[in-house]
């Protein structure tokens, strides 16, 4: 059995075409969705991610504004800029590219963004609303993962979902989203003994740790769905995920590739949240 590939690239194209139509409708009503992106320092990976986000915004007709600051900016100055953008009615979404320099507290930055403009879905208010099932901006990568699984026609209710990884950005929230869909959810992490014994129980295995090819065929139950969130650069310069794709695709029923899997969906969900923020702010 060779797994079916769930292509994030293809699914993202379809969703972005729908988003472009929605954005055009908003513009026809005099509302131009605007996303402000704040970039601190000169980390090459961060610059690359931001370029990708700007390009995607242009693709669907969202106005993107980039604010770049040196790594030496004080936390106070950065928070003042965020508060200025909170008050700007032409800005519907605010995104601060992570990671930040060590002297700036990440939580302080996230909590300063107005919850109604928190298109990353990281603000504690949005996280809390997600936990109790109230409408909220969902974090982009976990939401993208859920949409990918649903797009393949996979029934989630009653399935055992194992999440490897417990970050605030992916691991923790993705488990909660699948719990909301009536899955039984188990978390595994660096302190989990005998990882394979846990992951082999998964009907749906979601891996988000940032360790190249951590998951091999011995970790996967035959016929499982495997979602690879990790992005790692090998010494050769080639990108690979947390899953040994070539080996695991011979065991799984569905698998996501890296690149071309979860990545394009993360940015697509960011566009979705920005469009939704513009719609909600316009309705007020």
Curated annotation (Swiss-Prot):
Positions with a binding annotation for NADP(+): 165-167, 190, 231
Q: Which GO terms describe its biological process?
A: L-histidine biosynthetic process; methionine biosynthetic process; purine nucleotide biosynthetic process; tetrahydrofolate interconversion
Q: Which reaction does it catalyse?
A: (6R)-5,10-methylene-5,6,7,8-tetrahydrofolate + NADP(+) = (6R)-5,10-methenyltetrahydrofolate + NADPH; (6R)-5,10-methenyltetrahydrofolate + H2O = (6R)-10-formyltetrahydrofolate + H(+)
Annotated Gene Ontology MF terms? Answer: methenyltetrahydrofolate cyclohydrolase activity; methylenetetrahydrofolate dehydrogenase (NADP+) activity
One GO cellular component term of this record is:
cytosol
Coiled-coil segments, which residues? none
Pathway it belongs to? One-carbon metabolism; tetrahydrofolate interconversion
**What InterPro entries would the database entry show?**
Aminoacid_DH-like_N_sf, NAD(P)-bd_dom_sf, THF_DH/CycHdrlase, THF_DH/CycHdrlase_cat_dom, THF_DH/CycHdrlase_CS, THF_DH/CycHdrlase_NAD-bd_dom
Q: What are the protein's UniProt keywords?
A: Amino-acid biosynthesis, Histidine biosynthesis, Hydrolase, Methionine biosynthesis, Multifunctional enzyme, NADP, One-carbon metabolism, Oxidoreductase, Purine biosynthesis
What EC number is given for this enzyme?
1.5.1.5, 3.5.4.9
Q: Which cysteine pairs are covalently linked by disulfides here? A: none
Family membership: Belongs to the tetrahydrofolate dehydrogenase/cyclohydrolase family.
Fill in the subunit field for this protein.
Homodimer.
Functional summary from the UniProt entry: Catalyzes the oxidation of 5,10-methylenetetrahydrofolate to 5,10-methenyltetrahydrofolate and then the hydrolysis of 5,10-methenyltetrahydrofolate to 10-formyltetrahydrofolate.
Instruction: Tell me what this protein is called.
Output: Bifunctional protein FolD
Which organism is the protein's source?
A: Geobacillus thermodenitrificans (strain NG80-2)
